[in-house]
Amino acid sequence: MEKAVHLSTKNGPKVPGEPTKTGTSMVDTAASAVQSFAPINQIHQHLCAFHFYAYDMTRQVEAHHFCGHINEDMRQCLIYDGPDANARLIGLEYIVTEKLFMTLPDDEKKLWHTHEWEVKGGFLFMPGVPEAIQRQDLEKVAKTYGKVYHFWQVDLGHQLPIGLPNIMMAVTRDGQLYPEMIKETEKQFGVSIDKERESRAYMKGPDHGIHPLANGGGKGLKLELREVDIKPVESVPRVFV
């Protein structure tokens, strides 16, 4: 199967539509002056990592996470295909501590992936942040689990978000990512995956080890759509029509 890789916004498909008009920008500016964006204002960090489709490891995407803590045990991230202002919102990820992960039903656990090798392998980093500062948080991230969905298949050149959401996974060992993808990201952000790895060798993963049901339980996962009967509101005899 031919590999599909998406590295950054600059390499992505052009979104169809007219340029934003002055009138629209003026309305946006006026609204932003009086409205609160409290949820977005909770975003406190930018993490760059790589995801692959849970049913097709040959399809790999550079994923930029903009995250905020809900509490000490959970954070939530908006995922874009680049760090630029025109980046596309392609997905979201929930990150929980091992403590919360262990409370999940077994059928749910397979939807979550580990972050241990992402962190220890040097594949997850905070662009522009000194490594010494990064390590203070990445020590915690290495022990966590994440659940991530992508809604926009930019690696296939889709100009709009088409199709079903896709469950994504993260790297768990060497040899899974394309070398050219790693090199391009290193060049773009001025980082060295090998040096990052050396400085994080002391870090530990989940205290109880990687759960055997995590990471898809070692199997591929793919969402499928099927038609079902819709339960209507009692006062409405028909649904939609």
Swiss-Prot record:
Keywords: Lipid droplet. Belongs to the OBAP family. Residues 1-24 are annotated as: Disordered. Disruption phenotype: Irregularly expanded oil-containing structures, 40% reduction of triacylglycerols (TAG) content in seeds and 98% decreased seed germination rate. The keyword Ligase does not apply. This is Oil body-associated protein 1A. InterPro entries: OBAP-like. GO terms for cellular component: lipid droplet. It is found in: Lipid droplet. Expressed in seeds. Not detected in stems or mature leaves. GO terms for biological process: embryo development ending in seed dormancy; lipid storage; response to abscisic acid; seed oilbody biogenesis. Pfam families: DUF1264.
